[in-house]
Amino acid sequence: MPTYNFAAGPATLPRPVLEQVQRELLDYQGSQVSILEISHRSPVFREIYQQAKERLLQLMGLSADEYTPLFLQGGGTLQFTMVPLNLARDHHRVAYADTGHWSARAIEEAKKLPDLTVDVVTEAGPDFAHIPAVPDLPADTYDYLHITTNNTIMGLAYQDLPQTAVLLVGDLSSNFLGQAYDFSSFDLIYAGAQKNLAPAGVTIVVVKNDYLTEDHGLPSMLNYPALAKKESALNTPPVFQIYFANLVLKWLKEQGGVQAMDELNRQKAGLVYDYLDQSKLFSNRVAPDSRSLTNIPFTTGKADLDQRFIKEAAAAGLVNLKGHRLVGGMRASLYNAMPLAGAVALRDFMHQFEQEI
């Protein structure tokens, strides 16, 4: 019986990549040492790092003449602070769209900075059923607009990016390279890798080169220009995670790239949503035009029945379906590495469970 891991993160990883890592773990490409042991200053790692940068930009349709990828530490959570420190320079006033828990966390952290005004310019409301429209923002008032493209807990996602006159910053942690956006619309993107790209421990930042030219005297580890100058190696970078991410980027290209993953993810999500929409037992409260492709929360409406479903699903090989503690119920995370067969198995088990109730 196959096992499908629906965890929200750390999440399922591509099987071919895991197998390659297993083969190379004790002796990386004839070097006689493990990838876990190589120096971050060695030619071996520098080649891995350059490959990862090039593959990432290629998958995103971006040019190295305009954007620089960074492979950092501290998770998306550190970016909640680094973004305003580096970008809120002209007006010291920033705009945020609040569409769920993680956007609220970003707002909370930005508000801790002195001499910075943080405006919540749009919010999803208490039911978190719709992605709200973003109002027109004057370029002479705000330094940037921050959005969270996908909220894992509530299951909301932007299908279309807001058009804005100010810089656009995106937290893409949970649908990074799994949903086809025009990445050139962003001035800065960040994403924790532990959902779609690698094990936890590396955070991707892709920033326009325009914002790497001036050093504002920030502490070095919080300073994008300083980190870019040292190619993400002001301190020892997470070598293994970058190596792993490089292999996943190669795998993504072999699958057909971001557009192909978007199409597959829509197919997977569609199977689950179509069942939920006709079910008399299960429900999902998010409006169809705001639904996440990668994180689908659902519930029976009864806590004891939810727990029974989670337990019986796990026994059937469908693991980590428990919803986030803030909302309860169930949640199916269908990241890039989740095969179509996993979504089919979940839909079929939901049908079986409902028939037996």
From Swiss-Prot:
One of its GO terms (cellular component) is cytoplasm. It is found in: Cytoplasm. Its cofactor is pyridoxal 5'-phosphate. Its EC number is 2.6.1.52. GO terms for biological process: L-serine biosynthetic process. Pyridoxal 5'-phosphate binds at residues 76-77, 102, 152, 171, 194, 235-236. Pfam families: Aminotran_5. L-glutamate binds at residue 41. Binds 1 pyridoxal phosphate per subunit. The modification N6-(pyridoxal phosphate)lysine is found at residue 195. The keyword Iron does not apply. One of its GO terms (molecular function) is pyridoxal phosphate binding. Pathway: Amino-acid biosynthesis; L-serine biosynthesis; L-serine from 3-phospho-D-glycerate: step 2/3. Keywords: Amino-acid biosynthesis, Aminotransferase, Cytoplasm, Pyridoxal phosphate, Serine biosynthesis, Transferase. It comes from the Bacteria. It is an enzyme of class 2 (transferase). It catalyses: O-phospho-L-serine + 2-oxoglutarate = 3-phosphooxypyruvate + L-glutamate; 4-(phosphooxy)-L-threonine + 2-oxoglutarate = (R)-3-hydroxy-2-oxo-4-phosphooxybutanoate + L-glutamate. Catalyzes the reversible conversion of 3-phosphohydroxypyruvate to phosphoserine and of 3-hydroxy-2-oxo-4-phosphonooxybutanoate to phosphohydroxythreonine. Homodimer. Belongs to the class-V pyridoxal-phosphate-dependent aminotransferase family. SerC subfamily. This is Phosphoserine aminotransferase. It comes from Limosilactobacillus fermentum (strain NBRC 3956 / LMG 18251). The gene is serC.
